[in-house]
Swiss-Prot record:
Protein name from the UniProt record: Portal protein B
UniProt source species: Escherichia phage lambda
GO cellular component terms, semicolon-separated: viral portal complex
GO BP term, example: symbiont genome ejection through host cell envelope, long flexible tail mechanism
Annotated GO MF terms: DNA binding; structural molecule activity
InterPro entries linked: Phage_lambda_portal (IPR006429)
Matches recorded under NCBIfam families: portal_lambda (TIGR01539)
Swiss-Prot/TrEMBL site (Cleavage) positions: A22, G23
Keywords for this protein: Capsid protein, DNA-binding, Viral capsid assembly, Viral genome ejection through host cell envelope, Viral genome packaging, Viral long flexible tail ejection system, Viral penetration into host cytoplasm, Viral release from host cell, Virion, Virus entry into host cell
Job of this protein: Forms the portal vertex of the capsid. This portal plays critical roles in head assembly, genome packaging, neck/tail attachment, and genome ejection. The portal protein multimerizes as a single ring-shaped homododecamer arranged around a central channel. Binds to the terminase subunits to form the packaging machine.
Tagged with keyword Hydrolase: no
UniProt similarity note: Belongs to the siphoviridae portal protein family.
UniProt modification remark: Proteolytically cleaved by the viral protease during capsid maturation.
Subunit structure: Homododecamer. Interacts with the terminase complex composed of two small and one large terminase subunits.
Amino acid sequence: MKTPTIPTLLGPDGMTSLREYAGYHGGGSGFGGQLRSWNPPSESVDAALLPNFTRGNARADDLVRNNGYAANAIQLHQDHIVGSFFRLSHRPSWRYLGIGEEEARAFSREVEAAWKEFAEDDCCCIDVERKRTFTMMIREGVAMHAFNGELFVQATWDTSSSRLFRTQFRMVSPKRISNPNNTGDSRNCRAGVQINDSGAALGYYVSEDGYPGWMPQKWTWIPRELPGGRASFIHVFEPVEDGQTRGANVFYSVMEQMKMLDTLQNTQLQSAIVKAMYAATIESELDTQSAMDFILGANSQEQRERLTGWIGEIAAYYAAAPVRLGGAKVPHLMPGDSLNLQTAQDTDNGYSVFEQSLLRYIAAGLGVSYEQLSRNYAQMSYSTARASANESWAYFMGRRKFVASRQASQMFLCWLEEAIVRRVVTLPSKARFSFQEARSAWGNCDWIGSGRMAIDGLKEVQEAVMLIEAGLSTYEKECAKRGDDYQEIFAQQVRETMERRAAGLKPPAWAAAAFESGLRQSTEEEKSDSRAA
């Protein structure tokens, strides 16, 4: 007896089963089987990143060194995330520490003054190599994170110095973090990072600078933290999932397109040069067969003599009657020859549109706007420019918070510990916790970098004033958007007002208006009080 077959329900195409057709198409063969050959392996981040880690970073380095758009992308990160001065805004958690707000503000003023003296010293005492100020180190860290996906800073102690502070920092290239003797990865040592069973980093293997390459390479193990909790080696990157050991550079998703765009630009430039080389051509009556006989039969003695003789006749003729394009004389050509002037041709041929399409794709992968990446602001309205700038600003603020500020805060904590021990700054006496007991509370701070790009200065100021007047923002926030510290602005305004008054100058319009408004308001309050009485 034949077993009956159960009919299978098919999808609208009459071939795919309804169960497969009704599911997620991304996991199937796709429309027309277009996804059938696309079978990427399911891997962890380390499994996908670390086998080709060195090559990927080397390619990113090459792009930044030799590709203008890649170099501009790194410059955008530095200018918009950090700017020219990375300013400390110290904010100890005074409620948690059990101190008063005024005590906390007084302590913060002492800390900020001492930190600026140490961090922005023109002698670069903060840097082991004596090449960088603190802001320069943050700018380098942001650039390093962009094209290497991570940044490393080593906190050191200068025992031979006679300076007040012994804390120093060394910027460490990610290229120097690798397994000892370039051995393969293991469960607890991956790409130069020693980790515990939970995946937390315990220490790092740092190789010496191998240039010029004739000395044997040596590795030094540096712990992540010292026994007292002080940071010894700072490693900042943004993991995308659990178990990730090293960071992935921002160019991975657009690396192929950037390299091909480089090749395309070079080819287009060569084509334009070739077209511009020939202003005119002379065509001879020599037919194709005779020309091929000359070329293909040049190995025989007879053909070589014929070819040499023919070229000699042409050379002798034009030597006696040269062809000139810049003169007024109309030249006489050799009988049978014709002069063809080459008109200028369009070397673009749709290239600009194609380049814009590629640059938009690259800009999306790098997190910046097309206009910023290409430096092309033509045909943009105010609304379009503002929307584009706001999108990039949100990206840059995220990077400032999770990359630049993390590096800066950990460096600041190392210095603050020494400043407290040396009594350069004094903790409030009524504090509930010591520095070692509440490092994060004492070192809590914000960092003010470059301001948001102003598309229309007048409209930006009007917006800030309206937000403050409506109670939706504060002077602190609006000044921070412009890259300024509101306390410094207020203090400077007071000084300038007093100096103008001492010099017999009128106060600025805003100050006069504010004074009149305050006087009018106080007068009205006095009148209302008198009526009530």
